[in-house]
Every structure is written in C-alpha cells, then in structure tokens.
C-alpha cells in the first residue's frame, strides 16, 4: 500500500439558518504514507475534528474523495474499524461501569483478535503504560490520565495500521503526557503504526510528529516537515553565547541580524539568518573574537512558526 490516507478535494458543508451553507472543510487534498507521524494543527473551528470524523466514517463528505487503508470509510466502515484505531480526548470507547481489563476483553471479541495476539499486545501495553495498578478498577473511577492510557491501549490492541488521535493529551498532567508521548513514539518507530494527531499542545506535536499540516477555515495553509516550516516561517535562529568576561555587543558578524546583551555583557544572544550563514560559521567567528565559556543554538519554536502562519 502506497498510502494509508488519501484525501482529494475533500469538502464538508453544514447548513445554517436561512439556507446559508458553511464549508467546515473546503477542498482539502493530502496523502499520508505508511509509518508517518503527522500533526494536524489549527485553531478552534479550523475543521480538524470535522476532517477526522470524515476519515473515520462518522460524517459523509459533501464532495471529494477519502480513502483510508484503501477503503471508503462510509461504505466499508465496519471493515475499516478493524484496521484503524481512534482516540477522542472527550469521548470514551471503554465501558464506564466495567473494570478496565474487562473492557479490553470485550474489545478483543469485537475485533476478533486471536487470544495469543491479544495477550501479547496487552502485556506490552500494560508494561509500557504502567496499567497494572488499575486494571481491575472500573473506568468511571479512573483519573483522566489513567483513562487516556486505557483509551490508547484499547485503540492499539487489534494492531491497527493507522492510529488517529483527536486531542489525546487535553487535561493531562505532565507525567501522564510524558508516558503517552513516549508510548506513541515507540508505537510509530518500533511497530510502524501511522499516527495522525490533532493537538493544541504544540510542544507535544513537535516531539511526536515529523510532518505538520496546518489548516484554517477548512483549508490547508501549509504541509511540510517541521524543519521546512521553521526555515520558511520560523524567523531567525539564535546563538546564545556565555562569555568568560563582559564584552560589548558582538556586532558586525556575518549573517547576524540582531544582538541582545544580557547579564552585563556576560551573555549575548545573536539572531542570525540561516540563509546568510551557518551556525558553525557563526560560532567560529565568535570564538575567534572573544573568550567563550559556553554557547548553544536555539531553533525557532513551533509556537513561533504557527503564530507567523496565522498572523502573517
């Protein structure tokens, strides 16, 4: 299979008062290859959740075409359910009054997973996500972090080709977020599970996804790798230099756009253009001029990239 996900001119309209039709998703075209980890970014109302609902068969497109694992998600929704996993941050696929372990057992039957394969997958998830202490606890009594770890496990027990996660870290504490990030990164790198995530927590996206698709008003603004987006929209890189002794601003260096002097001249931040000079060239020029105690390069943050995209 060349692609796990194929969207071609995808459009979804909703009827508003007085017959006015609003396009929540407006002509989106993109493809996702097996093993990719793709972050879908956009403000509230951008069309992310509507797109997720169409590719999982919950909503029917107004126009365009969508194929997931080579299947039409509306016409072959039951077959597709055995090949993808879905996690909605605000909606559970677990049985509220049953212990977590019993929910997993029911899902094994629903997806017709062989007992040996189910046991292997479950043991792996229990170990990596540290589920053992609350497997016997009814889902309604779990904390949000515990339940979300259970949701991700439930979505992966049938070995899906594609895992779709809609705001999976919303409301989670730092420890729960980290456990989930590490587990998802492993599922992608080791098991080859294709990931499609929507998140508002941009650092989470940065750590999990090598490709970002930014949408607004139902349209794709940009689609590319994080490095590519940084180069195009992130602005200047920064070289932070800690000096052995105070020094006047290090001006006149090649490619340097701006110099910020801190700590009475002991620290200087040099904003530089990657198109005019490399970090290695700038470091060599700095070291040739002053005695350096430490230095490091700061890349434009993903927040900077997204802010530039939305504000122009």
Language-model features: locations:
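Conserved ABC ATPase signature
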Residues: 97, 138-145
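ABC transporter nucleotide-binding domain
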Residues: 181-273
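Catalytic Walker B motif of ABC-type/P-loop ATPase nucleotide-binding domains
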Residues: 163-167
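A short, flexible loop at the N-terminus of ABC-type nucleotide-binding domains that lies
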Residues: 1-4, 13-27, 77
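Conserved catalytic motifs of ABC-family nucleotide-binding domains
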Residues: 159
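Helix-to-loop junction immediately C-terminal to a conserved catalytic motif
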Residues: 56
